[in-house]
Amino acid sequence: MANPERIDVMVCLATVTPPKLVQVQVSATATVADAVRASGLLEEVGLSIDACRLGVYGKRKAPDALLHAHDRVEITGPLIADPKAARRRRVRRVRATGTREGLKWLRNEAPPEDDVAG
C-alpha cells in the first residue's frame, strides 16, 4: 500500500550531456528544490540550484513551488552561448554569401554597387 505522505516524482537533468532521469520519493508537501536535492543530480555535474532553471513539465517554476504526484521536474543548465551573439553570427554568415536572403536585413542601407543602374 502506498504511503499517502510520500509522492513519486521524476527529476530530469537536461544539459549538454545526455539527459538523466531519476525517480525519487519525497514528502507530499515537497517543493521543486526538495526534489532536486533528493535526486542528487546537481552534485553529479557540479552545478548549484541557483545557476539552473527549474520547471515542471516544461513550464518554468520557482524552487519553492509545490509538487504533485507523478510530476516531472526538469533542470536545465545555464546557456552556453548568448542568443543575441549567435543570431548576429548567423546573419553575418548569410550576408557573406551574397544571396538575396542576406540582403533583406539591409533595407535601410544603400544597395550594393553592382545593383545600381548606371
Curated annotation (Swiss-Prot):
Disulfide bonds: none annotated. InterPro entries: Mopterin_synth/thiamin_S_b, RnfH, RnfH_sf. Belongs to the UPF0125 (RnfH) family. This is UPF0125 protein RSc1426. It holds the Pfam family Ub-RnfH. HAMAP family: UPF0125_RnfH. It comes from the Bacteria. It comes from Ralstonia nicotianae (strain ATCC BAA-1114 / GMI1000) (Ralstonia solanacearum). The lineage of its organism: Bacteria, Pseudomonadati, Pseudomonadota, Betaproteobacteria, Burkholderiales. PANTHER family: UPF0125 PROTEIN RATB (PTHR37483:SF1). SUPFAM superfamilies: MoaD/ThiS.
